[in-house]
Amino acid sequence: MNQKILEQLEFQKVKEQFQPYLQTAQGIQELRLLEPSNHYDKISDYFKEIAEMATIFVENHHFSIGNLRDVSESMRRLELEADLNIQELLDIKKLLLVSGEISRFYQDLENVDLQVLKRIFEKIEVFPQLQGSLQAVNDAAFIENFASPELDRLRRQIAENERYSRQLLQDILKKNADYLSESLIASRNGKSVLPVKNTFRHRVSGVVHDISASGNTVYIEPRALVQVNEEMTQLLADERHEIARILKELSQLLRPHSRALANNAWLLGHLDFVRAKYHYLVNNKATIPKISKDKNIQLLNVRHPLLKNPVANDLHFADDLAVIVITGPNTGGKTIMLKTLGLAQLMGQSGLPILADEGSKIAVFDAIYADIGDEQSIEQSLSTFSSHMTHIVDILEESNSNSLVLFDELGAGTDPQEGASLAMAILEQLRLTNIKTMATTHYPELKAYGIESDYVENASMEFDSQSLKPTYRFMQGVPGRSNAFEIARRLGLAETIVKEAEQMTDTDSDVNRIIEELERQTLSSRRRLDHIREVEQENIKFNRAVKKLYNEFSLAKDKEIEKASQEAQAIVELALTESEEILSKLHEKAELKPHEIIEAKSKLKSLVPQRDLSKNKVLKKAKKLREPRIGDDIIVSAYGQRGTLIGQVKGNKWEAQVGLIKMTLKEDEFQLVKVEAEAQKPKKQSINMVKKANQNGPRARLDLRGKRYEEAMQELDAFIDQALVNNMSQVDIIHGIGTGVIREAVTKYLRRHKHVKSFAYAPQNAGGSGCTIATLG
């Protein structure tokens, strides 16, 4: 498709209307590169994708990809043996997560027949092991302690060093209080320092890091702290080195799969783009047009996509119709109709829904050419006519029988008689070479050309003679007429003058009267057609409502049958129980022989209906949702750490990837993380309580890491209350090591609480001093 037509018809602005519906960087990129195609099968597949996406939304009501950043540069860096940074790993982690979710979404689809989208969904690869490894990077772009034993050890040492350093500073602060400008610990050049009065600078031994602007205060790092700070500097350097090593290891894990991951990003972006097309279709009352294998265009109630309140029009450009000539005065909407046809074709050939009614049809052209507006080139010093004619010459040379040509005000800018003759000659050349053409003109001579020539049709834009305003309604088959006399009358020009003018143009008046009658007939036909369409739309709505009621009735009927079956079974089971009691009593009285009792019991049991639950769709779906599957995110109950299931060992045992560590877990040792459900529910302020495996009674876990003091204490208080209400026997409180402030506050709180029997740090393999286990009672 030639690029000039995309600029002339502002196709870029049309594409921009789809961007708000996109969620992924790859989807936005696909939209940016979108251009019209001239391949019938390709366009057909585009339309089938939208139709299939519609069936997905009908059955599931929601389908979301989620925000995915561009990972193409990260994939290139992997191929160049470069190591990725934390943000890049986080982006890939999100890609892996969404890939797994969409793959599971596809597997769970029911009552949906996909042909084209099936190929997209089934090409998405899932990598549960990689997903589990990247759990080492949390959503805050922070490398978790469990990423490696060495990192965990270093961070424990750093926390201990910070605690010792702070305590040491507090002691020094108290000891040298009389020498200080302020009783506080300051920071200079990343070092903890004391603000010492200049007059006492020699009383405090240490390294001077700064002096205040007034010179009255000297900031000294106490000598006792120098060695501690040097150790801290080394620990922080070791931490950075270990993080770099972990990033390198994670990059090496991803490198062999870089192309597959890039392909996943493209597939998800494409699904996102199809989803955006569907939402545009629904929100703009657009339609998926049929594709004509010949050049038969049929646009029903087509609208211009860039106008705020466009007037809908019908356009029938049959295969045997070569040229449509729109005649009539300016400002009636002729150019808009021309552009509407061009944009409908560009959108359709790009696989986009068009703003028209169902039943519309587009053709497939190799190229679309247009000469629209004043394209005068000042640099070339060309007149308006010369500029247009230069462009028209190019169009005539480049176009062929599989092109669509659009001319606005053909032949304008020169002597009217010569311009009209040129316009007719150009249209005749296009007609003879069977090039589909729509042209606008205000030359009356072209009306006769439209009537006298085969495969040519006149058209015009409706004008309201009462309001003296154009209606912008397209009138196909009716040539345009001048409304000058009628307008003059209504504006108050003397009737004698108007009649004299009419007598001077008797022939034209006769033609105008014929055209006026044609307009009336066309308007009457259009009203009848509009009424028929309204009835059709009502029938469609009625049909949909009936289907909906039928489905609801079927579902209600199934529920009633299920309920009746349950009640019947309960009655029979009750009767069976009572009968067994009677038989047992009779047996005790020896009134029946053992084999007679067995036979009687057998007959009674045969009365109980055996319910086939395998066909119960609700139970099947619920069971499927509850079952763990490869790729599911989990929380390990014993540690509260997040991981991903990468395989089923046997029975109820699963292999999980937690950071860089693999674990074998039973199903009661982890909980599934329902990411989709969490994303869809509105967020509420709640206590971060995660259920644990049942060890010596109910237990729960509260994570206070990263919380401020006041926030942590409020959550702890609410958590203990909730645990007591739920009869929890033990709870785990994760506070981390950090500065020790939260840990000490937790200890004080538990010591004071009358319902806390005892508490202690967790075992070393379950959190150590970073986690406190409290026994309640």
From Swiss-Prot:
ATP binds at residues 328-335. It is an enzyme of class 3 (hydrolase). The keyword Nuclease applies. CDD domains: ABC_MutS2. One of its GO terms (molecular function) is endonuclease activity. Residues 702-777 form the Smr domain. InterPro entries: DNA_mismatch_repair_MutS_C (IPR000432), DNA_mismatch_repair_MutS_core (IPR007696), DNA_mismatch_repair_MutS_sf (IPR036187), MSSS (IPR046893), MutS (IPR045076), MutS2 (IPR005747), P-loop_NTPase (IPR027417), Smr_dom (IPR002625). The keyword ATP-binding applies. It holds the Pfam family MutS_V. Its EC number is 3.1.-.-, 3.6.4.-. GO terms for biological process: mismatch repair; negative regulation of DNA recombination; rescue of stalled ribosome. Keywords: ATP-binding, DNA-binding, Endonuclease, Hydrolase, Nuclease, Nucleotide-binding, RNA-binding, rRNA-binding. Gene3D superfamilies: 3.30.1370.110, P-loop containing nucleotide triphosphate hydrolases. Homodimer. Binds to stalled ribosomes, contacting rRNA. Belongs to the DNA mismatch repair MutS family. MutS2 subfamily. Endonuclease that is involved in the suppression of homologous recombination and thus may have a key role in the control of bacterial genetic diversity. This is Endonuclease MutS2. The lineage of its organism: Bacteria, Bacillati, Bacillota, Bacilli, Lactobacillales.
